[in-house]
Amino acid sequence: MTKKRTVKRKVKEPEPTKEQPSVSEQSENEEDEDLLQAVKDPGEDTTDDEGIDQEYQSDSSEDLEFESDEEGNYLGRKVSNEAEEGEDDQDEDDDEDEDEGEDEDDDSDDDSEESDANEASATPKDDQPSSSKAAAAQTKEPIIQIIPRDPSKPEYEESDTSDEEDIRNTVGNIPMHWYDEYKHIGYDWDAKKIIKPPKGDQIDDFLRKIEDPNFWRTVKDPMTGQEVLLTDEDIALIKRVNSSRIPNPEHDEYAPWIEWFTSEVEKMPIKNVPDHKRSFLPSVSEKKKVSRMVHALKMGWMKTTEEVEREKQQKRGPKFYMLWETDTGREHMRRIHDPVSAPKRDLPGHAESYNPPPEYLFDEKETKEWLKLKDEPHKRKLHFMPQKYKSLRAVPAYSRYLRERFLRCLDLYLCPRAKRVKLNIDAEYLIPKLPSPRDLQPFPTVESLVYRGHTDLVRSVSVEPKGEYLVSGSDDKTVKIWEIATGRCIRTIETNDVVRCVAWCPNAKLSIIAVATGSRLLLINPKVGDKLLIKKTDDLLAESPNLDIIESERIKTAVQWSNAEPDEQEKGVRVVITHFKPIRQVTWHGRGDYLATVMPEGANRSALIHQLSKRRSQIPFSKSKGLIQCVLFHPVKPCFFVATQHNIRIYDLVKQELIKKLLTNSKWISGMSIHPKGDNLLVSTYDKKMLWFDLDLSTKPYQTMRLHRNAVRSVAFHLRYPLFASGSDDQAVIVSHGMVYNDLLQNPLIVPLKKLQTHEKRDEFGVLDVTWHPVQPWVFSTGADCTIRLYT
Amino acid sequence: MRRPKKYEAGEATQYISRRAALRKLQLSLNDFRRLCILKGVYPREPKHRRRAQKGSSEIKILYHTKDIRFLLHEPIVWTLRDYKIFAKKSGRDRAIKDFRNLKRRLALFPEIKLDHIVKERYPTFIDALKDLDDCLTLLFLFSTFPSLHLIPREQSNLCRRLTIEFLHYVIASKSLRKVFISIKGYYFQAEIKGQKVTWIVPHYYPFKPQSRQEVDFKVMSIFVEFYTIMLGFTNYRLYHGLNLAYPPQFPSSMLQDNEETLKDETSFVSERIAALNFELLRTDKVQEDEEEPDIDMELLEQDGDSKRIIKMKQEAQEIARLRNLFKGLKFFINREVPREPLVIIIRSFGGKVSWDSSVFSGSTYDESDETITHQIVDRPSLSTQYISRDYIQPQWVFDCVNQRQLLPTNKYFLGEELPPHLSPFVDAKRDTYVPPEEKALHDPSLIETHAQSDDESDEEEAAQNEDDTVDQELLDAQLQRAYQQETAEYKKYGGPDGVNEDEEDTDDDFDGEQESDEEEEELDEKTKRLQEEKKKMSVQSGKVHKVNKRQLHKAEVDEHRLQARMVKPRHRNLFRKLIREKQSKEKEEWLLRKKRRNIDNDTKEAKKLVKREAKKAAAAAAAAASQLGVK
């Protein structure tokens, strides 16, 4: 009771100061309250101002009571009742509180009183001590506590009362901050606003903290905004809860155990009924089940867990057995079509060793190159970088090992396979087996003489039939006659134009050279050798035979025969045949009576045949079959070879018809030469090739030789020896063996023998012409370097 | 008659593109890949791609139509389809959490059976042996793998088992022929039933996480799936051929995948090696110590002795020797040496091997065993050494096997700089360059000269020629002085006449050189005259015709070059290609030779320098000493 008083005082003390401003606002409420008060307690008008405060005070006191209820204190309530009874003056406030509630309050009050009465009746002894001191009562509470709780009624009432006291504010269980912006904090039972108590500022709080010794136990009630002073019991309760003990201080944790149900097994049955028979007998159905299982186990239909486990173990992993009965025995089975086994990987060389010989290790340059080809590793010389380790222990795992294995796997299943015949032959094998040149001697092997004297490139060269003298025609407009054995220039004959071609008459009884210079063909008596022969030739050429045949206009316009002018006569020129176009080539028939000339620009009159004895010319072709390159007489038969750019045509001069057309399959023919027996033709072309035609065999070349590295200018057969030579722009003269057998079944044998390369290069030209000595195995070549060379 | 359309016959019908094949087989690409790998079906290169692809010229993957039709009848295609069904159904069970059903389904997982495929791909046993290279290499790699997402533990365990079984066979049959330490791994070559089987064992530890683009383990795993089956059957037959029990029984609990070995990689490896060090159980009790007599040999003797047969005979004898190369030798492997390859090699050539029992299991004798003949060490020095044994580096074992003889160990001693390790697989046709070390091996005479030139002659020459000129002069001067003193003493005390005369002569020489010169001139004139007379009189001795070799060679080359131009036109391109290849090869060879020459010169120079410096230092020390002595 002392505590209650203190509470009242405490609350009262701060209130007056704050209340005054709010009085005017709440005047209406006050009036209502006044009315009520008037009904209930008319005597206490004086305390009008503090009515609200008192209400709150009472409220707090009721709270206390409620709390005490919670603690199971019946006493607190009784005390209050007693206080009402005993000390009216003091506890008027309480009464007022109760009065201010609704009518029900009264009832509840009554109930509580009744309950009090009941309690009193139940515990007659307790009444007396409760009046003394709460502290003293507390000690006795545990005993009291049990008794009132057993019957439900007082408890219910208690809760009822607590309810009634508790609900001062009728807003319910809502967050109280909703009222933060309002002056009131809710509504009481009479639907009147409960005004918030005034708030002190921090200084006030601080002052109170200093001054008030009970400040620490003052708590604010959120529902009403009132400050509540906690009692000692409250604090004790809080402490207990905080220390997680049972809130009721009276609860005895160490109370003696009461054994409601015994743990001992009783010997005698509780019930007096005997057990059924089937509790003694084994179950028939189970027996059946078990016997079935036993049977299943016996028969192997069912397996024990152990067996199952063992089987599983065995089942795991593949089973191996003798798949192949013998090593090589083959059972007929379907296989994939045409199997191609994958090739094995290359085995490692020295470079892959962990400790290779030092030359295999990369030096800086090689390393750089290797690293440079990072993006195209297939171009690398080695797919790894050779490395040297001092000891086996230091060798690390190869970083690309997995990748290599994976690539091999990809190869095996993704790489298209095909069977290919791989040639595993030596390059030597492809070279045809030919006899050694040493067995095919004689043939020219060394350069023995150089004929110097011309000042421009020497176009053509020809040898006297007896083999003593040599004639050459050059671009410096001269024809020079040389003595072969000494290399001396015997005579120089100047002409008016570039000498394209010179040809010594093959008839040994005549001493005539045909010289093609510009568009004129000069027949020159060289005046060397046998004097008789010279004289005879001069005589022969001096008299012109009388022409009884009238030539056609076509020939007349093309060719004019005339005797040479006196000044030319001195030089040795005997007859001049003037053509209408520049002559490129002149060639003699074997007997020395006929000669043919070629004028490439002459269109359909580009080839002409002249007869010396009759001083007559013919045009064998009426139609142009192409750009004629060169012409040739057959050594034996009356045949005429005409080489156009691509093809060679062979004409019969007697029948005047085309015998054969040889297909060269080359772009540009440069020259040709016929074997002295007349069955084989050698053709040189500007596209580096030489073609050997066997005229009896086919119109296609028997053999194509690519001996030269550049355009072949000329070819020549030896008259006696089985030799032929070719001169080319690569400054080489190549001497080859070209044996033609009398046996028709045997193919000609062609063996390149010697490459003679002494000419110098000048303006892309090398060797321009080659000619054989008529008797000796000597070859003459003329070159762009203004020299004629003799190889023996 | 209907006019045939284009691409209805011929090459176009022979090939089928992969897309079409997939459609025909009704398989996904993954399943098709798996099927192809297992069945050994591979794409084909058509003769005319354009025709085979029905006119399109882009490069497609083409299969033989017959192959695809063959796949159509393959029973495992159904298993592959069952997988799909299984995945669908078990996925459903999992989704609706029907675990009872799921468990039942898992027990019924469709197993793929590959036995018939092995037989079909390799109709004879020899065929299987021919294709063993890739199989072994891949399985050896997989046997070192940890458990991966795509490679189940069971698979790598199976690989381990099978490879060890194979190694046991190699050891038992003594069929190992060549070994090689490469930077990629250890190459082994065995000759099994006349087939050369080569495999690579990678250096530890080969596994590294790989990106998907680099390495697809799934593909490799499928290969391994087939190869394990194949190797299993091969092993079975090989073991039975040797009268060995299969699966092999090992003493103790080798090869049991107990938890410990799986957990610990090192113990895993050590168990693997330990298993190799035990004899296998034989089905027949007869110990097959004696060599089976070679039937071939007898036959050969009957046949007579053509060159080839003699060669074969030699080869057979050599191999017989090789098989017992290490017989009677006891090896001990130090713990830093990679043991697996060494154990295989030593055991398969008849040696005994052991290692430190405290570190690895499976050792048979201790280091302190006095009967050990060789201890293999791979560190620069060893604290405790026994006199009774050779301490060698592991390369010795490899080189011995490749040379087929026990090499002298001096070059392989502890801490010695090793001679280069040469590959036994070089093909004389492929690699024309032969390093000097290999030349020396073929020709024992070269060894000595090489060694001599290396060690003695060169250095001495150098020393005499260049280094010691100063020293030599000094020495000579000293000697001469000593000699003069001696002669002077001799004069003083008198001696035999002959000696005196000699001295006079020498004195003359010293004093009157001019006189002697004059005399000589006179003599010369006389002789000249005489000679001239003689020349007139006598027949001159003929001069030997000197052949200019270089010119001759040039002529030959020219000749050959000309003849080479006579190659038939249809062979010309091929000829050119061959020549180009030859030239590049020659160039390579030349480069290597040049490099080697430079290196040798450099090392020689370095040696000389070292020696010279040493000598100089010695001379300086000697001079200092002599000076001290004089003082």
Swiss-Prot record, chain A:
InterPro entries given in the database record: BOP1/Erb1, BOP1_N_dom, WD40/YVTN_repeat-like_dom_sf, WD40_repeat_CS, WD40_repeat_dom_sf, WD40_rpt
Keyword Repeat recorded: yes
Subcellular location: Nucleus, Nucleolus; Nucleus, Nucleoplasm
Single GO MF descriptor: ribonucleoprotein complex binding
Region: Disordered, residue numbers: 1-167
Repeat region (WD), residues: 453-494, 496-534, 578-620, 623-661, 664-703, 707-746, 762-792
Keyword Hydrolase: no
Cellular component annotations (GO), alphabetically ordered: nucleoplasm; PeBoW complex; preribosome, large subunit precursor
Compositional bias segments (type: Acidic residues): 44-53, 60-72, 82-117, 157-166
UniProt-listed Pfam families: BOP1NT, WD40
Origin superkingdom: Eukaryota
BP term (GO), one: maturation of 5.8S rRNA from tricistronic rRNA transcript (SSU-rRNA, 5.8S rRNA, LSU-rRNA)
Basic residues bias: start-end ranges: 1-11
Key words, A-Z: Nucleus, Repeat, Ribosome biogenesis, rRNA processing, WD repeat
Signal peptide coordinates: none
Record-linked PANTHER family: RIBOSOME BIOGENESIS PROTEIN BOP1, RIBOSOME BIOGENESIS PROTEIN BOP1 BLOCK OF PROLIFERATION 1 PROTEIN
Function summary: Required for maturation of ribosomal RNAs and formation of the large ribosomal subunit.
Annotated family: Belongs to the WD repeat BOP1/ERB1 family.
Protein name: Ribosome biogenesis protein BOP1 homolog
Species this protein is from: Drosophila mojavensis
UniProtKB/Swiss-Prot annotation, chain B:
GO MF terms, alphabetically ordered: ribonucleoprotein complex binding; RNA binding
Basic residues compositional bias, start-end: 543-552
Domain BRCT, chain residue ranges per copy: 321-414
Basic and acidic residues: bias regions: 525-536, 553-562
One GO BP annotation of this record: maturation of 5.8S rRNA from tricistronic rRNA transcript (SSU-rRNA, 5.8S rRNA, LSU-rRNA)
Positions in coiled-coil regions: 510-541
Function of the molecule: Required for maturation of ribosomal RNAs and formation of the large ribosomal subunit.
Protein name (Swiss-Prot/TrEMBL): Pescadillo homolog
Organism: Drosophila mojavensis
